[in-house]
């Protein structure tokens, strides 16, 4: 047996029916599409239409909502900040702000601020000025001898400040 000799078993596949090739074929003229109407034309299928049966997207219940007041925060882990300090991208003596994080390349753009998370090891004594911080992050920073100050500015103010930091880089 060779790869080019592999075939389906006899009768395992049904021959393709060519439609619209004369009335003698049994699938001529309208080609199994019925008569006239949108569904008889080419290229038209009605998305989500299940032949009059209640479609899936209407059978399932609605869930949840989108909170228009939610803050879109960048999440930054302590380990990532420590890597930037070790690489010389962040000044360990200056305050770690949103602008400094953008300039160091830790976050690509400031959204509505930054939330500091406690994943990773922090060995440098740093002072953070962020929008929010988790309990584990605050404990880790204070254990390393640093401090965390939470400040909130409107998203537009953060974005403007961060863009200024990138422009001056």
UniProtKB/Swiss-Prot annotation:
**Keywords in alphabetical order:** Ribonucleoprotein, Ribosomal protein, RNA-binding, rRNA-binding
Q: What is the lineage of its organism?
A: Bacteria, Pseudomonadati, Pseudomonadota, Alphaproteobacteria, Hyphomicrobiales
Organism of origin is: Methylorubrum extorquens (strain PA1) (Methylobacterium extorquens)
| GO biological process entries | translation
The terms under GO molecular function for this entry are: rRNA binding; structural constituent of ribosome
> Which Pfam family is one of those matched by this entry?
Ribosomal_L27A
Give an example GO cellular component term for this record.
cytosolic large ribosomal subunit
- Kindly state the subunit structure of this protein: Part of the 50S ribosomal subunit.
Would you tell me the protein name for this molecule? Answer: Large ribosomal subunit protein uL15
